[in-house]
Amino acid sequence: MLFGREQFTVPAEMGGEVIDKVYAKELIPTPIEEYEKLPEDEKKLHKPYPFDQRTYEVMPGVICEQDVAVPMRDGVVLYADIFRPADDTVKVPAILAWSNYGKRPNEYRPDELKAYTPGVPAGSISNSAKFEAADPEFWCPNGYAVINVDIRGIGYSGGYHEQFGKQDAEDGYDFIEWTAAQPWCNGRVTMAGSSALAISQWHIAAEQPPHLACIAPWEGMSDMYRESLSEGGIPCIKFTNFATAGACGLEGIDDMGAMAEKYPLMNAYWEDKIPDFSKITVPAYVTAGWNHFHLRGSVIGWRKIASKQKWLRAHREFEWPDFYERHNMEELKAFFDRYCKDIRNGWESTPRVRISVQDRFDDDFRVDRPEDEFPLARTRYEKLYLDASDMRMKRENPEQAVEAGYDPATGEIDFDYTFTEDTELTGYMKLHAWAEARGHDDMDLFVTVKKLSRTGVEQPVTLFHGTAPHPGAWGKLRVSHRELDPELSTDFEPVQAHRRELKLAPGEIVPIDVEINPTSRIWHAGETIRVQIAGRYIRDPHWIEPLMWETDNAGKHVFHTGADHASFLQIPVILPKYDDDYVFEVDEEKHPTHPIF
């Protein structure tokens, strides 16, 4: 339940199923002067939210048309603030900011939003910006309009708020087509922003609005069930409640947390929140942070979209400092200039894939290394076999069968392997193991792949300009959800089906495959790779997000290794682009002989 708010249910037909959709009452949008008069105990049910249809000057040469009404195909009206150059003689493209976070978050408490964007230097974002969105005071002087939208069910916009999915995507389609027809617009619309504003781009682009010129999803999930509400099958409802707690509207919000409790397995409701990537054909500039929960979706989205013109940049930093970093804003401008203004600025020479290879702390081994694809074609998958006799990993499966276990409430087990030569791991890892739950019928597993120095000291990577430690690549699994989806799984990326629960019988030992999110990191000779298995999430307590899982653990977790229970960590070893025997030859298809010769 969303912070104890009143709920109601609306039946809906989805994918041939009748789904009882749970909605929660939102905070009530209230004009500031009325909000201030409310008794303190009533204020918690309201949110100061002005409605004021006017046009005003934001800065020299830039105006804002505030609370503009935009009709959707079903008659529901959405409201938006349109920031644009004041000169109507020059038509400009528009950047759409689409999320439920409110179109004017800085109006009542101007410093509140800035507190939610750590890592971004003070003064970097203007008060015109919507949370996680393009800043109008940067983009409008550069010849763009920025539209901050209160999407369906948010603020004074009509209807129930649907979090992602078909309804939200259709609204995005309608809004883009309305925008393109405005007299100040050049007929091209794009989208920008991180997190929720990136997720919405996948869904809206899949609807193929004719005037959507390109997209720039800056870290966005591809599957709300597998990547947010039930990663690995382990419920994580508190974060969703945290992220939507401030939503305000007149009707109600799609309560994903309540739906995860009501429908804990994959069904049509959750499938509606997975975009059809095969229908995304517009140019796309996608970013992925190696250490953030949007990672899986960002990479999968880039891999699966049908766009012939698509770029991926994978980096170490968190989404907010990366999005507002000046160089990255200028690079995004070059991308938008190319596809929204037809400026031939050489964008096509940008490498299709750029990868930052992490080392330790804030030190990257390589930054923006150009590649042609992801996963890399020169990947060699190797297996490091777990051996519980000495808690090491070996190149061969141990002949002796041994077990190791821990109390899931307090303990964990570590398996180590020390590299004898510099080794880069870039791509997908997976853990294949044999698990037993003693004294219970299920196990929630939290797997982390760490790096240790030559002296055995753990070496995390750091985010937010070196202030927040992150241990490394991770994966999760509720063992009763171990069954794989054969259509989605590959040899390097096991994906659970989540269609049924397979509880464990007493004494039953089962094989499991844990999907580990992609990464890129270097281990120097003498450094150790550690795979840690635990029954709880182990991370620095000062981490920014309240990532809390509803675990189902009891008794003892036992893992069997060796002999008939071969268990291993599969790693993506990256071979050098050129070995010692490489002889350079010109690729005539890529570089044909010039006619002058």
Residue ranges and their predicted role:
Residues 2-27, 31-39, 44-50, 55, ...:
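Glycine/threonine-rich phosphate-binding loop and adjacent beta-strand/alpha-helix elements that clamp
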Residues 49-348, 352-355:
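Active-site-proximal cap/loop segments of hydrolase catalytic domains
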